[in-house]
Amino acid sequence: MAPGDEMRKFTRSFFRACPDLSSVTHAIVRQKFLIHVGRDHLEPEEKQALKRLVEEELPKMQADAGTREGKPDFIKVKRSPAPCSDPKKKRFRFNSESESSSSPSSPDGSGPSTKNRTTKKTCLRRALKKAVESTDEDHQTDLDAKMGLEESSEGEAEGSVRSGKVTEEEEDMKQEQKGQVRKQAGAKDKQVPLKADRKQVREESGSSEEEAVLQRAKVEGSTGANCQEESEESGEESPAKKKELSEPRSRSNRAERTARERKSYKQKSRPGRPTGGLRDSEAEKEGGTVGSGDSSEEGEAEKEGGTVGSGDSSEKGEAEKEEGTVGSGDSSEEGEEHSVKRKSKVRTQTESGRRQNTSSRDDSNSTQEQAAAQGTTKSGSLGSSNGDSDTEREVSDSQAGQNTKEERKSRSSNKSSKNGQARSCSSSSDSSPEPTGQKGKARSSSSSSDSGPEPTGRKAASRCGEDHPAVARLKRYIRACGAHRNYKKLLGSCSSHKARLSVLRAELEALGMKGNPSLEKCRALKLQREEAAEVAALDVANIISSTGRPRRRNAWNPSGEGTSPGETYRRTLDSEEEQPRQAPPDWSHMRDIISSDGDSS
């Protein structure tokens, strides 16, 4: 083979295999040719010849690059004329959107798309097999097949994405058509002009797919017209229905929104005042909003009125609030009547509280302080004026974390007996400034009384800390051994649990416990100690012990330090009678008398 023909063949094959011809240079072609030939360098004549070949073949390949893109379609039509000769199926990728939109009434809109995909895949496989078998150069044909496969896979991916969009649009249209009432069957025979159809197709699909959609729309004229007409009719009906449904929804949404805002505001204000009721200004404000006609505000006013009484009325107010938010605006009159009744009840309660206050002013300061402290914890208290509300909130905030347990106890025990006193105290705080001062004193006393139990709590905590489970277990073992110890003296110097445990273990060892202590061992040790005590009580040698603290009689006889107390006792007895010494009598049967006499002398 001539070197010129070999160069020409190489350049053509290289340009066919190259994916991007714009990046090809003379140096790249020369390097590839040297690798192909297996040489180190080229002669100047060969370089010039290769340069001319590149300049000749490169424009040709660039001109043919556009035709290479349509090569897979050409192969498909050429190799498998039966499944791919139909132009409609060939261009299904572009026409699938108009076809699916024009036939929404079909039960399965993805059926033809899946069939066409399978036919495309089979055509592509056959074409690739033919190309691989027919070509002579293995390397070049492999590259061509790879390029064709990439292009076809990209096309198929685009087609699948478009078909997925089409199926989603079709499902949306079906869901809209299910919820709306369709018109009469006579509308199926009508046809919409081609311009309207073209306009809708442009809105649904992109401008790049316009021509294919128009061709498909001409073929599917009648079905597309019917579908468009139904969609337009449904689009005309939907705004009217939405307008009709939006008005009651907007009203109910407003009511629910206001209810939520009020509820959230109350929940924010309640933690500061855990049990305190509403102030007069807030009650008047809530009562003034009743006449607005909004059902949620009326229910809220009912709830606020209900909190003035006992805890049961607050639950009723919450139930009325929920009913007011769910119901429509027709229940406004009933809500106004309920709120008026609540207001009248509040006024009567305040008047009765003032009367009771005039009668209860002569009572002692202790009863007033107790009533004021109880009034802060009761849910029926109305509160003082707006100026004192901030300070009372701060006091209640400081007391909230300390006396929650005491408040619960006081509520459960004094709820029935102290309602009248709390109301009278709260009404007196509204009428005159003196009770407010007394209430402040009562609150300060209650806060001091609340702060008083803290040391007891600390002592209890320290006791709980001393009574560690292991410490308590060892104490129980010592008690089971029959020994009773003063643990305050024994464990007074210990500052940790380990030190206490070591002291208690040493005490058990001193009692005779060996190994790991247990209740059975302790019971056995107790029996042994009791038996040993009985034996010691019966021993004669233990009548008078020479050990122990010094007696007073030793001070009278300074020379008798070396002598035992028994000898001194006998000496004193023998000194009275100057007789010859006889054998000492056995005083064992009289040891109690002798020991008591010796102690008393």
Curated annotation (Swiss-Prot):
Name the source organism. Mus musculus
Query: Iron-sulfur: present as a keyword of the record?
Result: no
Q: Which segments cross the bilayer?
A: none
The residue ranges flagged as biased composition, category Polar residues, are 347-378, 556-566
Query: Where are the residues of the annotated region Disordered?
Result: 60-469, 546-601
**Residue numbers of Phosphothreonine PTMs:** T135, T141, T167, T391
What ranges does the record give for the region Interaction with the histone H2A-H2B complex, renumbered to this chain?
A: 429-572
- In what way is this protein post-translationally modified? Phosphorylated by CK2.
What keywords were assigned to this record? Chaperone, Chromatin regulator, Nucleus, Phosphoprotein
Question: What are the Low complexity biased-composition ranges?
Answer: 97-113, 379-388, 413-432
Point to the regions of Basic and acidic residues compositional bias.
Answer: 66-76, 130-149, 186-205, 238-264, 313-324, 568-580
- Protein name per its UniProtKB record: HIRA-interacting protein 3
Disulfide-linked positions: none
Q: Which InterPro entries match?
A: HIRIP3, Histone_chaperone_domain_CHZ
Q: Where is the composition biased (Basic residues)?
A: 117-129
Q: Molecular function (GO) terms listed?
A: H2A-H2B histone complex chaperone activity
Tell where it localizes: Nucleus
Q: Which residues carry this modification: Phosphoserine?
A: 85, 96, 98, 134, 152-153, 163, 205, 207-208, 231, 234, 238, 313, 359-360, 384, 389, 396, 398, 564, 575, 595-596, 600
- What does the record give as the function of this protein? Histone chaperone that carries a H2A-H2B histone complex and facilitates its deposition onto chromatin.
- State any GO BP term from the record: chromatin organization
Q: Name one Pfam family in it.
A: CHZ
- Fill in the subunit field for this protein: Interacts (via C-terminus) with histone H2A-H2B dimers; the interaction is direct. Interacts with HIRA. Interacts with CK2.
Cellular component terms per the entry's GO annotation: nucleolus; nucleoplasm; nucleus
Signal peptide coordinates: none
